[in-house]
Curated annotation (Swiss-Prot):
Gene Ontology molecular-function annotations: aminoacyl-tRNA deacylase activity; ATP binding; valine-tRNA ligase activity
Protein name, entry field: Valine--tRNA ligase
Species, as recorded: Picrophilus torridus (strain ATCC 700027 / DSM 9790 / JCM 10055 / NBRC 100828 / KAW 2/3)
Sequence motif 'KMSKS' region, residues: 510-514
InterPro entries attached to this UniProt entry: aa-tRNA-synth_I_CS, aa-tRNA-synth_Ia, Anticodon_Ia_Val, M/V/L/I-tRNA-synth_anticd-bd, Rossmann-like_a/b/a_fold, tRNAsynth_Ia_anticodon-bd, Val/Leu/Ile-tRNA-synth_edit, Valine-tRNA_ligase_type_2
Length: 768
């Protein structure tokens, strides 16, 4: 009896203790840019779906003769880690000294990593889990800071006071890649501007209005374009300007241009330069006149009250409205003016598009998302965050002249917030103050290939062969990695990028705690086994979304058991027989070898193309329908006629089936391969089967005709509720020559006592 959980635990420990997947450089090297998961939560079904994909290829390429560098890492710095630590350890920066806060974050991250390692370990990933990187480590900090200094010296990173996106909840600047569009219910407020009515969802920014904007083709406003109107309550004048971007059907077709209500405001402000009125200060609205230090909600309520009291409010109506929100917390963002660090990207869009075209996208249509993102970029990448647990900027500022002072590379890693410096500004002053911001976590994740390769002192192997990631972070992780690769190396970061879809519950719903439909990977592994979970992960094409369907997990578990039973049958049938495949005579063996080689060729081509689901389906069809249902049944008698040949062929096929399943289902295949080859270190280190034309026999597939007859007799017995081993007498019409050549096989396999054969164009069977 096979205990799947016990078996899987045995081989996990075996791989780990014997360093089976330790990277050993060779002549052919294959490098995977592994996504480093954050430590801000548990492994979820999205991980359990996407991470096996990279392991399929890692195991396959090892068997194809490559030295596979499949590294592991944790993205354990930045805002997600801070949020996790504050929740788990009940500490905040407000009541904890910075050095102590950093220490607590680091300790909590390390504790979480130990638990998370087991989650990925349980999936059967063939990483070298003994040698992983952490983005918060001194090693990663040094490299991040060094590359940042290079960008500054090459005028690709700069500090500027400019409009920037800010999250009021997270209290930090963010970048365009951190935003998502969210539809919310809000009030559309209609306001009277000296006879022209405008509609706005941000009435609290009335004191920041610097212009009114209409569409130049709107007949209602053509005559008043370029005229001036008075801003209600504030009594200053603004000009009415026109722009094609204004939707004539939204509200009244006339809008306020404020500094700044949203990204559209910023675009118009940059285009027309109407002046600036900043009233958002420290996440509060403060115009010094009407609104003084109120939150957005409080300010909105107050300004509507004042408009109503002064007869400027026409009406309000409830609408659904799309707003920019922070992807991390869902808070609507604000745009303020502040000093931040940026990496230039707007001036190299063409180069980034060219690099995207040099990468093979799997599936190809996912490249369009990257191209649309790059083409639509409107901001340089803001990389500074007003947070605490992240990569420090290796920067000081001169208090006397405002100059920027960079750390020497020999000093790295350095945290200017916690350590003094003897450096002096170029003006001669030693009166320096540290940069207190930290780098965006994407600024470190975007150099993952560099971190992994420098971890083994092998930058000469750049670029990596492939990156596996979700489609939801094409505009963040894929984009920033390509950007950094261009800026530092003028090269692609990887030759291929494989994009996976989302995971949904059995009914196609997105999983969430509020819906109560969360499914834990550990629960599935405990019930069905990791091999079954990996089988489920191989059921969709690249880029496709997937449902958690029990039938896929059941099918995976059944495949584990079927492999186990068929392997034991082959071992039993071939026991104590010295096999040989030097001269294949048996019609059955010639047929099965021809079928196998054609299957092998198809599966190999599909695996080479990263079509894991189609490859596994091809293999499933051969294993279940051809090998198990027919060949294994036939050789129970055939082995008596051709013992040496059939013993050798059956073992050859079973061993190669095990090898071909091993990238997808590594646990059961490791167990079974050791039954056939006790001295093997691992099936994953064995050679993948190679297509052999010598085993393609002319006319061998004519035996499909006999298989069709056998299946029809099976169906008859089943309909008659007869045991497959029960004797039966039949009259069989068909191709008399083909049937006579295999009559003994038909009689033996289907227990036909009396077989009457006659010629016919079609197969006809009658029970006698």
């Amino acid at each position: 009896m096979l205990d799947i959980n016990e078996m899987e635990n045995k081989w996990k420990d075996y791989w780990f203790n014997n360093d089976v997947f330790k990277f050993r450089p060779g002549n052919k090297i294959f490098i995977i840019d592994t996504p480093p998961p954050t430590v801000s939560g548990k492994m979820h079904m999205g991980h359990a779906y996407s991470y096996p994909h990279q392991d399929f290829m890692a195991r396959y390429m090892r068997m194809k003769g490559f030295s596979v560098y499949y590294p592991w890492g944790f993205d354990d710095n930045g805002l997600p880690t801070e949020r996790y630590v504050e929740k788990e350890r009940h500490v905040t920066i407000r009541n904890t000294p910075l050095d102590e806060y950093i220490k607590i974050c680091r300790e909590a991250s390390r504790d979480a990593e130990k638990i998370l390692l087991k989650n990925w370990y349980d999936l059967g990933l063939s990483c070298d889990f003994k040698n992983y990187i952490e983005t918060s480590s001194d090693f990663s900090t040094r490299i991040s800071q060094e590359l940042f200094i290079d960008l500054v010296l090459n005028n690709r990173a700069y500090r500027a006071e400019a409009p920037v996106i800010r999250c009021p909840t997270c209290n930090t600047a963010i970048s365009q890649i951190d935003m998502k569009d969210t539809e919310i219910d809000t009030d559309l407020v209609y306001i009277n501007f000296s006879g022209i009515e405008i509609a706005t969802t941000r009435p609290e920014l009335l004191g920041a209005c610097v212009a009114l904007v209409v569409n130049p083709n709107d007949p209602r406003y053509k005559k008043i374009i370029n005229s001036e109107v008075v801003v209600p309550l504030y009594n200053y004048t603004v000009r009415i300007i026109s722009d094609d971007s204004i939707d004539m059907n939204f509200g009244t077709g006339a809008e306020m241009l404020c500094t700044f209500g949203d990204q559209h405001d910023l675009e118009l402000w940059r285009k027309y330069n109407p002046g600036t009125r900043i009233i958002i200060k420290n996440d509060l609205i403060d115009d010094g006149i009407i609104i003084k230090g109120l939150s957005v909600k409080e300010a909105r309520k107050e300004i509507i009250k004042k408009l109503k009291e002064n007869n400027y409010l026409i009406k309000t109506e409830r609408i659904k409205h799309s707003v920019n929100t922070h992807e991390r917390c869902g808070t609507p963002v604000e745009i303020i003016i502040s000093k931040q660090w940026y990496i230039k990207d707007l001036d190299i869009k063409d180069e980034l598009l060219d690099l995207g075209n040099r990468i093979e996208w799997i599936p190809d249509y996912m490249k369009t998302r990257y191209q649309n993102w790059v083409s639509g970029l409107k901001w340089d990448w803001c990389i500074s965050r007003q947070r605490y647990y992240g990569i420090p900027f290796p920067v000081w500022y001169c208090k006397d002249c405002g100059g920027i002072v960079l750390a020497d590379k020999s000093e790295l890693p350095v945290d200017p917030r916690l350590s003094g410096t003897n450096k002096r500004c170029s003006c001669g002053s030693g009166n320096l103050e540290p940069e207190t911001d930290v780098m965006d976590t994407w600024a470190t994740s975007s150099i993952s290939v560099t971190l992994y390769l420098m971890h083994i002192n092998s930058m000469n192997l750049y670029p990596a062969d492939v990156r596996f990631q979700g489609h939801d972070i094409i505009t963040s992780w894929a984009f920033t990695t390509i950007l950094r690769s261009y800026l530092h190396y003028r090269d692609v970061p990887w030759k291929k990028i494989f994009i996976s879809g989302n995971v949904y519950d059995p009914y196609g719903e997105k999983m969430s705690k509020s819906k109560g439909n969360i499914i834990e990977p550990s629960t599935i592994i405990e019930k069905y086994g990791a091999d079954a979970l990996r089988f489920w992960a191989s059921t969709t094409m690249p880029g496709e979304n997937i449902k958690i369907r029990e039938q896929d997990l059941v099918r995976g578990r059944k495949t584990v058991i079927k492999l186990y039973n068929s392997a034991r049958l082959v071992l039993m049938l071939s026991d104590n027989i010295k096999g040989s495949m030097d001269n294949i005579i048996s019609q059955v063996n010639r047929w099965i070898l021809t079928k196998f080689e054609k299957t092998l060729k198809n599966v190999t081509e599909l695996m080479d193309g990263y079509y894991f689901s189609r490859a596994r389906s091809e293999l499933d069809n051969f294993f279940w329908n051809i090998f198990c249902d027919n060949y294994l049944e036939i050789i129970k008698s055939e082995i008596k006629r051709y013992p040496e040949e059939t013993a050798a062929v059956s073992r050859f096929l079973m061993e190669n089936i095990i090898k071909m399943y091993s990238p997808i289902m590594p646990f059961i295949t490791e167990e079974l391969y050791h039954e056939f080859n006790k001295d093997s270190l691992s099936v994953s280190l064995e050679k993948y089967p190679e297509y052999n034309e010598d085993y393609i026999f002319d006319g061998a597939e004519d035996f499909d005709y006999i298989i069709d007859i056998i299946n029809k007799i099976r169906a008859i017995k089943s309909n008659m509720k007869m045991s497959m081993a029960a004797p039966i007498s039949i009259s069989l019409k068909g191709n008399e020559k083909i049937i006579n050549d295999s009559a003994e096989i038909i009689k033996s396999v289907m227990h036909v006592e009396n077989l009457k054969i006659s010629n016919s164009d079609n197969i006809e069977i009658e029970v006698q």
